[in-house]
Amino acid sequence: MLIPRRVKHRKQHHPKRSGAAKGGTTVTFGEWGIQALTPAYVTNRQIEAARIAMTRYIKRGGKVWINIYPDRPITKKPAETRMGSGKGSPEWWVANVKPGRVLFELSGVTEDVAREALRLAIHKLPLKARIIRREGGE
């Protein structure tokens, strides 16, 4: 699972989810990609579940790129704890995904295999997304 090795600050403010993605909006490495249409926090478990769904479907063929990284900690206070006494401890890590961001890329497989693998991965993610193809000459 994707977790930062070390961070400057253990606890952070929640990132803003509004606005469109500034970079990473085109397919760069592979031939096919998943592009987010709505904003969301994608956890490290969801990224791993989508990756496993894709790689199991394409079996040994093709290559997968993960273009997002969960670098923001989300904290949580224990159950039945009174309010106050500081912020809770970090529980999981999220990637702040904005609309237009390409999350995963895939190449080295046929079109129907790529579309089905990416469709399976989209179902594991907490956002609306679409499958896009690389533009320009291959």
Curated annotation (Swiss-Prot):
Family matches, as Pfam families: Ribosomal_L16
Keywords: Ribonucleoprotein, Ribosomal protein, RNA-binding, rRNA-binding, tRNA-binding
Gene Ontology CC annotation, any one: cytosolic large ribosomal subunit
Record GO biological process: translation
Disordered: annotated segments: 1-24
Superkingdom classification of source: Bacteria
Compositionally biased spans, kind Basic residues: 1-19
One example GO MF annotation: tRNA binding
Protein family according to the UniProt entry: Belongs to the universal ribosomal protein uL16 family.
HAMAP family assigned to the protein according to its UniProt record, in alphabetical order: Ribosomal_uL16 (MF_01342)
Known partners and oligomeric status: Part of the 50S ribosomal subunit.
Role, per record: Binds 23S rRNA and is also seen to make contacts with the A and possibly P site tRNAs.
Protein name, UniProt field: Large ribosomal subunit protein uL16
The organism of origin for this protein: Micrococcus luteus (strain ATCC 4698 / DSM 20030 / JCM 1464 / CCM 169 / CCUG 5858 / IAM 1056 / NBRC 3333 / NCIMB 9278 / NCTC 2665 / VKM Ac-2230) (Micrococcus lysodeikticus)
